[in-house]
Amino acid sequence: MTNLTLALDAMSGDFGPRVTVPAALQALASNPRLKLLLVGIPDIISPMLVNSDTELLSRLQLVPAERVVANDAKPSQAIRNSRGTSMRIALDLVKSGEAQACISAGNTGVLMGLSKLMLKSIEGIERPALMTVLPNLKQRQTVVLDLGANVNCDSRMLVQFAIMGSVMAEEVVGVVNPAVALLNIGTEESKGLDNIREAATILKRIPTINYIGYLEGDELLTGKSDVLVCDGFAGNVTLKTMEGAIRVILSLLKSSDGQKKKFSWLLRIVKKWLQKRMTKRFGHLNPDQYNGACLLGLYGIVIKSHGAANEHAFKAAIEQAVQAVERQVPDRIAARLETALPKSD
């Protein structure tokens, strides 16, 4: 694939262009095939590009927008009044075929609502799901979905998520015959809500899915499964809890001790050595390195970045979009659904 064009909602996120513009330039510098359509308010963005490398600027196009979707906007109202916003225009570029993917750090509810409104759903998918790829303790990666797009999911939706997650594990992560599990409150078959148990029964009957059973929340990072499926409520709470805990641990490892005078010189050396070892061992779990949730189930690629993402994290979201485009994820999901998805009555 030679043409690789992405649309960036440059006004989105807690920090807006202060993060998205530098991240865009970094992404361009690391990928010579990449072209970016930077959607935003010209008067704000143009001054930030004045001293940029001319070669990078030749692969960057500023697409004017008039307004920004507020982070605290109510989705229904914001969607009705979305014309002229950077988010809507970025999605329009995907819909028209001018861009192959959209990346935004904006209001999650509005982004999901607009995406479903403007981009066609893949046949056989009732509702799209938010998915991310997490590193695990086996130095591999686990596909996790749904992360908040759907609070209530019936068994059929969970099965659809499992199929989409399996495709992602194969095509993006590169896992052969990925192991698929359902997030539950126990590993026994009798545990959990009816929708989870019903989904398990269906998944066992699909020959193209390597279903291995239930996993509990404390096994998210163990690498026992390549795909972990759950409803959006459980997934969002689990992800946010895990990210918060990891950030606290990493900050403690990097922080200086305020009581250094009480340590002997030998203990200080040992402490620094331990910090380096632990950071090297667990640094790959830093949430900034896997920022970006892909909205699966649409004929179009949409990546949702954390609103509080820094430059490094937003660049990671751009790179995730590149991977999804290169692997032609929507087409591969559609092809798998034709053969794997149980037909509805």
From Swiss-Prot:
One of its GO terms (cellular component) is cytoplasm. InterPro entries: FA_synthesis (IPR003664), Phospholipid_synth_PlsX-like (IPR012281). Pathway: Lipid metabolism; phospholipid metabolism. Pfam families: FA_synthesis. GO terms for molecular function: phosphate:acyl-[acyl carrier protein] acyltransferase activity. It is an enzyme of class 2 (transferase). Its EC number is 2.3.1.274. The keyword Cytoplasm applies. NCBIfam families: plsX. Catalyzes the reversible formation of acyl-phosphate (acyl-PO(4)) from acyl-[acyl-carrier-protein] (acyl-ACP). This enzyme utilizes acyl-ACP as fatty acyl donor, but not acyl-CoA. The gene is plsX. Belongs to the PlsX family. Homodimer. Probably interacts with PlsY. Its main location: cytoplasm. Disulfide bonds: none annotated. It catalyses: a fatty acyl-[ACP] + phosphate = an acyl phosphate + holo-[ACP]. GO terms for biological process: fatty acid biosynthetic process; phospholipid biosynthetic process. Keywords: Cytoplasm, Lipid biosynthesis, Lipid metabolism, Phospholipid biosynthesis, Phospholipid metabolism, Transferase. This is Phosphate acyltransferase. It is found in: Cytoplasm. The keyword Transferase applies. The lineage of its organism: Bacteria, Pseudomonadati, Pseudomonadota, Gammaproteobacteria, Enterobacterales.
